[in-house]
Design a protein with these regions (language model features):
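Active-site-adjacent structural elements that line small-molecule/cofactor binding pockets in enzymes
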Residues: 1-227
């Protein structure tokens, strides 16, 4: 994965990253993470589907390898309650101050509805509401608010991270890309060609009104003895 955040396109640096967890048991990854940092990787990004959850590999990495920035790419907006979502994000941000970014997205009908039994409805609104709630909760305020897709009554985080984590939105279509630019710190993209990434950057930076936004792009590589 690459994160474009003040010397690549649009003045943002390129940060090479790797998807985690790597093969093998989680408890065996300490040396592998250090090797990634030694090789020049700056970020690691977790996912959440049918294997490890998104937070546990990053919590281990936070303790094992302080050189790496940590991010989720992504946590589904549907599969945690609002309060639990905020608690998980705040805990990771507290474990790795200034090194954690939370990526949130709609995920898919298979993961949300078929595997978790949650209706996969109004994905744009759901992601938007989770982003807005996280911004409210991570700011330390007591949240009593009715969002379009859920409501929260009197929740205040009992843990306030030293550094508020960046919030990134997984997006492919223009509506979600503009949401990421307007209400989050950037976007996470997947399954796109280099030419598509250029077009995505134009949409995101155009909607950001001059505010720098990070673009995290997942790149699939198939290494072999011939490459």
């Amino acid at each position: 994965m690459n994160a474009y955040g003040a010397k690549g396109q649009h003045g943002l640096p390129v940060r090479p990253g790797m998807t985690v967890p790597l093969p093998g048991p989680l408890h065996s990854h300490k040396d592998k993470l250090s090797e990634l940092a030694d090789m020049g990787y700056t970020d690691i990004w977790s996912a959440e589907a049918d294997g490890a959850d998104a937070f546990t590999p990053l919590a281990l990495a936070a303790a094992w390898e302080p050189r790496l920035r940590l991010g989720t790419a992504i946590v589904p907006a549907y599969t945690r309650s609002p309060a639990l979502f905020a608690q998980s994000v705040a805990s990771m941000a507290d474990a790795a101050p200034g090194r954690f970014a939370i990526g949130v997205g709609s995920s898919s009908n298979v993961i949300v509805e078929r595997w978790n039994g949650i209706p996969f409805e109004e994905p744009y609104k759901k992601v938007r509401d989770v982003v807005r709630f996280l911004n409210d909760a991570l700011g330390g305020e007591k949240v009593t608010k009715e969002y379009d897709t859920f409501k929260v009554d009197g929740f205040r985080l009992g843990i306030k991270p030293e550094v508020k984590p960046q919030i990134l939105v997984a997006a492919l279509r223009e509506g979600m890309l503009r949401l990421a630019a307007r209400e989050a710190d950037g976007t996470i993209i997947n399954w796109l060609s280099p030419e598509d990434v250029t077009r995505v950057a134009e949409v995101v930076h155009g909607a950001a009104n001059g505010t720098p936004k990070e673009i995290v792009a997942r790149i699939f590589v198939c290494p072999s003895t011939n490459t």
